[in-house]
């Protein structure tokens, strides 16, 4: 479903924990990280699409989160031709997004990246609100910056953004929460305990090749 200008209606999600850290998901079998997002289906409202995408990509339910804010209008980004299927080139230009800022009310172990048969992410982590966006695919960086900036006014304690962000860049994670590889996965009764394995990684390249986060 495209608008007259060739943009697909979409929702983006910035998910915060109690420390105002932001959820980042590593795209399946890639070395790029992004926020949950997805298209709005015909007949859906942006809020309905947001809750559906939230569950599909993170396993979280409406009771696990609270809506803090949303962008006033659509934010757009164009997709380079090399990422567009040949049959829709000339018609499809990119995405227009309504962004939601959510506060997570549940626990980390409520996050499950295998909530559907087609997961988007194979690892996830919390990171500070303001970080360099080097690990985000280039054509999405501007819209990420716009969404983070507009929604920062809803933070409980507004994050202070330095002119020159300091600290490690997004790809360099000291701790990445990840489950065991599928061939060694231990079945755990999640009604009793939430079990996670923390994989040490100084850079993305050092992460295990088959990492699935969540239950």
UniProtKB/Swiss-Prot annotation:
Q: What is its EC number?
A: 3.6.1.-
UniProt-listed CDD domains: NUDIX_Ap4A_hydrolase_plant_like
Q: Does the keyword Hydrolase apply?
A: yes
Q: Which residues form the Nudix hydrolase domain?
A: 6-149
Q: Which UniProt keywords apply?
A: Hydrolase
UniProt motif Nudix box: location: 38-59
Q: Which family does it belong to?
A: Belongs to the Nudix hydrolase family. RppH subfamily.
Q: What is this protein called?
A: RNA pyrophosphohydrolase
Species whose genome carries this gene: Burkholderia multivorans (strain ATCC 17616 / 249)
